[in-house]
């Protein structure tokens, strides 16, 4: 489980990215780099480290499912992820 402060920071960062997304695109089209530079640092999506939706774990994140491999494995074994089943060969 990640620290509560890290999860809160991630949520705040998501809001900032969404808030400045359109403005950032307009400024890029206009090639107004001075105005882009004045935007908040955390409003750029590249600075965001994706986290597990369940417990906030930052490593081994699986984009397709929005969770880390640890929680993916646990939920897949319990049969709680639709369309995922254990394979054997």
Swiss-Prot record:
It holds the Pfam family Ribosomal_S14. The keyword Ribosomal protein applies. HAMAP family: Ribosomal_uS14_1 (MF_00537). Disulfide bonds: none annotated. The keyword Ribosomal protein applies. NCBIfam families: PRK08881.1. This is Small ribosomal subunit protein uS14A. One of its GO terms (cellular component) is cytoplasm. Binds 16S rRNA, required for the assembly of 30S particles and may also be responsible for determining the conformation of the 16S rRNA at the A site. It comes from the Bacteria. GO terms for biological process: translation. Belongs to the universal ribosomal protein uS14 family. Part of the 30S ribosomal subunit. Contacts proteins S3 and S10. One of its GO terms (molecular function) is rRNA binding. The gene is rpsN. SUPFAM superfamilies: Glucocorticoid receptor-like (DNA-binding domain). Keywords: Ribonucleoprotein, Ribosomal protein, RNA-binding, rRNA-binding.
């Amino acid at each position: 489980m990640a620290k509560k402060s890290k999860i809160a920071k991630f949520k705040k960062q998501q809001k900032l990215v969404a808030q400045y997304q359109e403005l950032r695109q307009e400024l890029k089209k206009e090639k107004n780099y001075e105005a882009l530079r004045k935007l908040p640092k955390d409003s750029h999506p590249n600075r965001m480290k994706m986290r597990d939706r369940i417990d906030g774990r930052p490593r081994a994140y699986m984009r397709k499912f929005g969770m880390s491999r640890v929680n993916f494995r646990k939920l897949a074994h319990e049969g709680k992820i639709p369309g995922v089943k254990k394979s054997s060969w």
